[in-house]
């Protein structure tokens, strides 16, 4: 189980990340002036039913804005205009070489004593990259208020991960705001991180709706829940901005998708074990799965996430033999790069790399991701984007062109039209 370490950091155990063993391993054999400020809405209690979901979030083309900052509800969130730094969307012609999209995403999005959220904001900023940070809702809930969380099929206040310290909540709020201003996406990793028995894979559509409603509420009401009255509001309206998420342990996508329709979400990143092919929609929502990548030195493939490399290297321990760290670091980095090169020189299908903010095996998985960002994001034709930005681009394309791209094998070389 997860716990609080001696330095007060929130720890995520292997058990909290892992799903069933068959999913965990997931290795298969295969080849100007200051704006005016107004207040909108009344303060809502975190225990009341949240307001009705917003309509479908609009794609990136910026809506008009009157320059006024609107503080929402109890002051936890605000509308500060269209998100800065969003890329222009261009429509492909038939046969035209598409960009090579790469999406780096992070499950949890907590700034704790390891300062990994701020580290990867900096990595993104310095390498022309945008990323998706999936916030776990209870990371904005103090431990003293844990019973505000009413998890499906569990007692109030129960969670499979630790609640944060007050200091970590304040640091996380800062990181969320700055990440959004820099053009990154804030998605959701839901709340309690329950897996397997009584986890998301066993939840009904209504139970998923409850989990989603609470994820919204924890963002909309953190000032009321924490008492951090002097902390500025988040610079976005989560009701309009939230476009998708990733379920803990990649469980329960079928009922999650049925629930997500009510919220106008654009994508879901909760499926697993698919080859590197151009995305399709499930139930009207873009499906962005973790992918199978060539494992270095083996005739097998591995899911594109830190945990799955760990499972192949040190099994069920996050503190393996330090003498093997350099080899494991190279394996992980080369695995991601193998997947990149296969599609960059082939079908140009988007590459999805998922991770947690963790220090497993001496931090080698964080270093591997940083190395890959620095290696690929400035290469010709590469766009390191968020999931929402990718959904914007896909929605702007001719469906016939996308269908042609889906017929390509990942490594299939093509003579693209200029």
Name each region found by the language model:
Residues 14-28:
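Hydrophobic membrane-insertion alpha-helices, especially the h-region
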Residues 63-72, 150-166, 231-347, 398-409:
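Active-site-adjacent pocket scaffolds in enzyme catalytic domains
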